[in-house]
């Protein structure tokens, strides 16, 4: 999920370096670069998105796992999207029927969110 909850100061505190995120897009305002791993300081999706379910899921997970285990997330999401956005046989047609704001979000993933996810996962 993209995340739209307001990020508050406590959401950026006491973060475990074992919970990591890979930037799926360049985030100029945060200095993050696509394909690079970072401590999972929100926002995890794109530079202007909010808090996601992955934020506290990942934090809770690392608290329960042995110290030597790290958790990483790659968030490639567009709010309000159907699963068709991630079906490479349907992506182009699905995007073509959406509002301009939606198309602009998809452009950040080169109009291929699933492909971007797979590219990042191979890094």
Model-derived features: where do they sit?
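Cell-envelope and extracellular/periplasmic
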Residues: 1-123
């Amino acid at each position: 999920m993209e995340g739209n909850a307001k990020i508050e100061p406590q959401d950026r505190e006491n973060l475990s370096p074992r919970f990591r995120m890979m930037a799926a897009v360049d985030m100029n305002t945060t200095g993050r670069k696509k394909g690079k791993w970072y401590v999972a300081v929100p926002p995890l999706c794109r530079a202007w998105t909010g808090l996601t379910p992955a934020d506290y899921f990942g934090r809770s997970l690392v608290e329960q796992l042995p110290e030597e285990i790290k958790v990483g997330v790659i968030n490639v999401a567009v709010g309000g999207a159907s699963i068709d956005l991630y079906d490479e046989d349907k992506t182009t047609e699905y995007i073509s029927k959406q509002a301009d704001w939606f198309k602009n979000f998809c452009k950040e993933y080169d109009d291929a969110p699933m492909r971007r996810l797979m590219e990042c996962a191979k890094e």
